[in-house]
């Protein structure tokens, strides 16, 4: 019985000791308080994912910039796709997708706490010309995962900022 308890406790402790954590459990201290998101496209999938992740981390996103403790300003959002490889018949075999988000984190007075930074992600997916629907679904799924990665990069900057801001 003691052996089972020891093995069970080791299985619980080892993953956390190596830094492993579940996705979307990146801790951003709630000491950040309230946050205002500024973007030219408030209805984009990226902004929706960012709002969801902030909410999960206990940060309240508000619509009034003047009442917010901090602002995340999305300056530019770029999506790009290009042919990554071609098959022997000269048709597209893979596409490369790129997304870049330029952002600034500012305090309530508008002072830049984190100057212009870029979150970038690049992925390649196989394109099957015989099954356009499945290739389209694959592209959408890859884009969704890319949004999650960009959001993680922005949250990481917020976490580092909040760690450095607290004494």
Regions found by a protein language model. Name each.
Residues 1-16:
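Sec-dependent bacterial lipoprotein signal peptides
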């Amino acid at each position: 019985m003691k052996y089972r308890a020891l093995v069970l406790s080791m299985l619980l402790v080892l993953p956390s000791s190596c830094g492993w954590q579940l996705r979307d459990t990146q801790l951003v201290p709630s000491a950040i308080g309230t946050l205002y998101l500024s973007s030219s496209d408030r209805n984009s999938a990226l902004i929706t994912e960012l709002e969801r992740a902030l909410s999960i981390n206990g940060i309240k996103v508000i619509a009034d910039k003047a009442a917010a403790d901090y602002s995340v300003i999305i300056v530019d959002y770029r999506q790009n796709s290009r042919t990554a490889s071609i098959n022997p018949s000269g048709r597209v075999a893979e596409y490369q997708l790129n997304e870049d988000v330029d952002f600034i984190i500012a305090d309530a007075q508008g002072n830049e706490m984190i100057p212009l930074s870029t979150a970038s992600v690049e992925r390649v997916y196989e394109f099957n010309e015989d099954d356009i629907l499945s290739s389209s679904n694959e592209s959408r799924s890859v884009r969704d995962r890319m949004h999650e990665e960009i959001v993680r990069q922005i949250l990481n900057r917020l976490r580092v900022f909040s760690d450095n801001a607290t004494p």
